[in-house]
Every structure is written in structure tokens, then in C-alpha cells.
């Protein structure tokens, strides 16, 4: 009996830790992106660093689509329908304020889904197009956090390049 109690207490603590740490990771990345992108002009966020490179605007569309589909849609049940190719080819050049609002709203949706996870939910089966080998929700949240970190790094680089170009 005591062993079961200790195990349940540990799992509850683990659940609290997972929720807290995932929320922190997603918020930190979003805050970094916002702080870097806010000083830029609309023209700058749609500037290609080289002919085949992604713009900051396209990366924001991509991150919004990725998180909206894999977490808000597949786990949260939002019904989001993704058009991944458009994330990289959209020519509408939405204003920076619109992109940041969409991205920020998506981060808030992701955090709301994270906070709803119970101890059992983390190990619930997860499959989605592109994540067929994922296995469980924990791995889906982890992959999406890693993906967000990867593209946050790209945005950091692009912002530094734009800053250097503006000094020349």
C-alpha cells in the first residue's frame, strides 16, 4: 500500500514538473522571438537572407502552423487544418503585428493544452501525419519544443544579419 502511495506522489510531482517546464520552454522561446522581431520593420521580416532562405515571416507562419497542428489540433482537438507548403510560400506579406499576434495566440493555446495534461495523458498514444513514429504525447510535446528551439535559433541568426546589414 505504501509503495503505491509513493509512486502516485512521484507521478503527481513529475506531472507538475512536466507542465511547469514545458510551459517555461514554450514561453521563453516566444518571448525571445517577440523581443527580436518587434524592432524590425514589416519589410525586414519578409527579407530573404539569400535566394533559397526562409524569411522571418515565413518562419513565424511555419511555427504557428506546426504548433497549431501537432499540439492544438491533434492533442487539443482544435480542428486546425494545416497547409504546410503555404507556410513557406505565402506571398501575402502579413504585417509583423499580425504574425506576432497569431504566433502568440498559438503559444497560449499550446500552453493551455499542456496544462490540461494529466499524469496518464503524457503516455497516451500519439500519431499524426509526419509524427507517425512519435508514440506518445510527451514525445510530441518534446519534439515540438525542439523544433521551436531550432527555428528560434534561425530567427536569432536572421535578426543579427539584418542588424549588421542596417549598419553598413
Protein language model annotation of sequence segments:
Residues 10-14:
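N-terminal intrinsically disordered/low-complexity leader segments
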Residues 5-8, 19, 23-27, 34, ...:
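Short, contiguous alpha-helical
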Residues 26, 30, 37, 103, ...:
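Hydrophobic alpha-helical core bundles mediating ligand binding, dimerization, or RNAP-core interactions
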Residues 31, 42-45, 68, 108, ...:
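Generic structural signal for secondary-structure transition and capping sites
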Residues 91-125, 136-147:
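Acidic/histidine-rich alpha-helical segments that form the ligand environment
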Residues 16-23, 93-97:
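Active-site rim elements
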Amino acid at each position: 500500500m505504501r509503495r503505491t502511495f509513493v509512486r502516485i506522489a512521484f507521478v503527481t510531482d513529475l506531472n507538475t514538473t512536466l507542465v511547469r517546464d514545458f510551459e517555461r520552454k514554450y514561453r521563453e522561446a516566444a518571448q525571445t522571438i517577440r523581443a527580436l522581431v518587434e524592432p524590425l520593420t514589416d519589410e525586414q521580416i519578409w527579407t530573404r537572407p539569400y535566394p533559397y532562405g526562409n524569411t522571418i515571416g515565413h518562419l513565424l507562419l511555419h511555427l504557428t502552423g506546426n504548433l497549431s497542428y501537432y499540439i492544438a489540433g491533434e492533442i487539443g482537438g482544435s480542428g486546425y487544418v494545416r497547409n504546410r507548403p503555404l507556410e513557406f510560400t505565402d506571398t501575402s506579406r502579413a504585417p509583423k503585428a499580425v504574425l506576432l499576434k497569431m504566433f502568440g495566440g498559438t503559444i497560449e493555446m499550446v500552453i493551455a493544452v499542456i496544462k490540461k495534461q494529466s499524469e496518464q495523458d503524457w503516455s497516451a498514444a500519439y500519431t499524426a501525419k509526419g509524427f507517425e513514429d512519435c508514440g506518445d504525447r510527451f514525445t510530441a510535446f518534446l519534439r515540438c519544443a525542439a523544433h521551436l528551439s531550432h527555428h528560434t535559433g534561425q530567427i536569432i541568426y536572421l535578426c543579427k544579419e539584418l542588424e549588421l546589414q542596417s549598419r553598413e
